[in-house]
Design a protein with these regions (language model features):
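Catalytic-domain carbohydrate-binding cleft regions of carbohydrate-active enzymes
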Residues: 1-170
Length: 170
């Protein structure tokens, strides 16, 4: 789609245009980063098999980064710093964060039911920390869909998510 995305972003910047990207805490099972995350144990696990908990948010299988695991958070922050901030992005949509599986196994044995509302806060914190660690605090705008008490101090903008739901269109 963009054979030289950093070059394209630089060209846009020269024209006074900002570039926003997209991220979420799911990784496609076909993505190269998935293999690394699986090898390091950075995904929420299936309680029965201990393998990554595979689900689908759209049309393809994905695993969810276990944001209860400090090492997984550090890994994903570094991905954001390298692959988004490092190529010149000016911000992004930090999507999802609300789909913590209630039957998954979390790092440290934490209860998914108790962590359900904390997960969006952890997602917002991860994004905020990536921006701060990169030294770009006031230059970057990112926005989250999911939130809970404490999220607003971690994210510059919140959006209400997708407002079209088939139940209400009939």
């Amino acid at each position: 789609l963009y054979p030289d995305l950093p070059g394209f972003i630089k060209e846009l910047h020269q024209r006074g245009i900002k570039f926003l990207g997209y991220t979420n805490p799911f990784l496609s099972t076909d993505a190269p980063l998935y293999a690394e995350g699986e090898r390091k144990g950075y995904f929420i696990k299936d309680k029965d098999s201990g393998a990554p908990y595979i689900t689908s948010t759209t049309t393809f299988p994905v695993a969810l980064v276990d944001l209860c695991n400090p090492e997984a958070c550090s890994w994903y922050r570094n991905i954001i710093k390298k692959h988004m901030l490092g190529i010149g992005m000016d911000g992004w949509m930090a999507d999802f964060g609300e789909y913590l599986p209630p039957d998954g196994e979390l790092f440290g044995g934490l209860d998914p039911y108790l962590e359900h509302n904390r997960y969006p806060v952890r997602w917002a914190q991860l994004n905020a920390q990536a921006v701060e660690e990169a030294g770009r605090g006031n230059e970057i705008v990112y926005f989250c869909r999911s939130a809970f008490t404490g999220s607003s101090s971690q994210v510059p903008l919140l959006w209400a998510g997708d407002q079209i739901w088939p139940l209400y269109t009939t």
